[in-house]
Amino acid sequence: MNKNYKNNLNESINNPSKILNEKIILGLDEAGRGPVLGPMVISVVKVTEKDLDKINSLDLKDSKQLTKKRREEYYNIINECFEVQKIVLAPEKIDEYMKTSNLNKIELSAFSKLSNHFLKEYENVKIFIDACSSSEQSFLNQFKAKLINKKVEIIAEHKADEKYKIVSAASIIAKVTRDNIIESYKEEFGDIGSGYPGDPKTKEFLKRFVKEHKKLPKIARGSWATSKKLLKEFEESKLHKWVK
C-alpha cells in the first residue's frame, strides 16, 4: 500500500461539520455474532455523499476475506479519515439480553442506536446495512420501525459487506475491534483459540477452566449451548463421583 495514500486521503476529506441538508451515507455491520467467547461488536462508518468516492477508492472487502495485516491497515485508515461509532456488547451483557430477547433483536437494537445517533443531526441520510435475519424485508421493516426518521433511505441486504464498500468498512472496524479484545484475553488466559464453539482450542480452554474453577470464565457467553453443555457435563461428573 502506498505510504502516502493515507495522508492524501485524509487531506481530501472535508471537515465533517453537522449540516442538516448535507447528505450522509452510513454503513453498518457486526462482528462476533456466533462465538462463545468475547463480545459482539456493532459498528457504523459515516461519510458525506460527496466523499463517498474516497471510500470506494479503497480496495475494501468483507473483513473475513482480508489478511490480518491488511485489515489493520484499513482499520487505521478508516478511523483516521471517516467518522466511526461502535457498540461493544460484553458477554455478560449478551447473556442478560438473551434472557428476554434473541440475537437478531439485540443486533437490531444496536444498529438502530448507532443510526439514530446520526439521524438526530442529519435529515438527508442513506443507510447501507448487512441484514442479519433470513428475510431481508422483515429485517428492513423491523430496523426502520426503530429509527427516529422513518423516511430515511435504507439498503438492507444479505452479504452487504461483500457488495458495498461502506459496509465493508464497518465490517473491518467491528472485526479488528473484536480481534484486539480477543488478543487481550490471551494475555490473561493463554491460548483460547478463536472463541468460536467449533474451535478445538476454544473448547479445550473452556473445559479446562470449568474443571479447575467450577464455573465459566468471565469472557464466556453462558447462554450459548456450548457453555450450557460443559456446565452440565461438569455437574454430572461430580454426581457420578459422589455416587461411586
UniProtKB/Swiss-Prot annotation:
Binding site for a divalent metal cation: 29-30, 130
Cofactor annotation remark: Manganese or magnesium. Binds 1 divalent metal ion per monomer in the absence of substrate. May bind a second metal ion after substrate binding.
Protein name: Ribonuclease HII
Coiled-coil ranges per UniProt: none
Cross-referenced Gene3D superfamilies: Ribonuclease H-like superfamily/Ribonuclease H (3.30.420.10), Ribonuclease hii. Domain 2 (1.10.10.460)
MF term (GO), any: manganese ion binding
EC number: 3.1.26.4
Family as reported in the entry's similarity comment: Belongs to the RNase HII family.
Role of this protein: Endonuclease that specifically degrades the RNA of RNA-DNA hybrids.
RNase H type-2 domain boundaries: 23-236
InterPro entries for this protein: RNase_H2_suA (IPR004649), RNase_HII/HIII (IPR001352), RNase_HII/HIII_dom (IPR024567), RNase_HII_arc (IPR020787), RNase_HII_hlx-loop-hlx_cap_dom (IPR023160), RNaseH-like_sf (IPR012337), RNaseH_sf (IPR036397)
Enzyme class: hydrolase
Cofactor(s), by name: Mn(2+); Mg(2+)
Localization per record: Cytoplasm
Gene: rnhB
Cellular component GO terms, alphabetical: cytoplasm; ribonuclease H2 complex
One matching Pfam family: RNase_HII
GO biological process: DNA replication, removal of RNA primer; mismatch repair
Reaction equation(s) it catalyzes: Endonucleolytic cleavage to 5'-phosphomonoester
Highest taxon, organism lineage: Archaea
